Amino acid sequence: MRLFVESQLLWNIDLNYEDLVKEFIEHYYKDASSYLYNYYQIIRDRYTYNVNVLDKTYGIYADISSTDLWDKATSDALYNCLINALNSIEKYRSSDPELFTKLVYRIKREMLSVYYIIIVNHSGYYSSSALESMINEFYELADYFQITKVVEGGSGFPF
């Protein structure tokens, strides 16, 4: 998304940043776009709140998975956006299986971060079977997207 927005602005600095974000999300996520735009807004608003209200800054080495940034309510809201997004594309399962699969993995790429936040910060709120299911899907998605570490130079996943 950032590459799309920045490249458009390089060609025309009079374009509206937020309109470009919406344009990208609408084309990339199709029917799920309203949920992904809401997901984007929650993340943006959470960072803005932490910087402007709580006076917390997040440098390159900051722990951006902390509960200060991602409290339970925010994590739940992000999770619900993505579940709703997955439900919104269900019609493509039979009508256009190739598009369905493409959209599922685009949405599930975002789910990786949400699973990580939930597993690391809020695991006590979930049953052991629900948590195990999240961890298993996290590892499956990490493998699919060839993600092997949480941070550069890190040793892997903490669970």
Task: Describe the residue ranges of each PLM region.
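Catalytic cores of enzyme domains
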Residues: R2
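Catalytic domains of carbohydrate-active enzymes that cleave complex glycans
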Residues: V5-F159
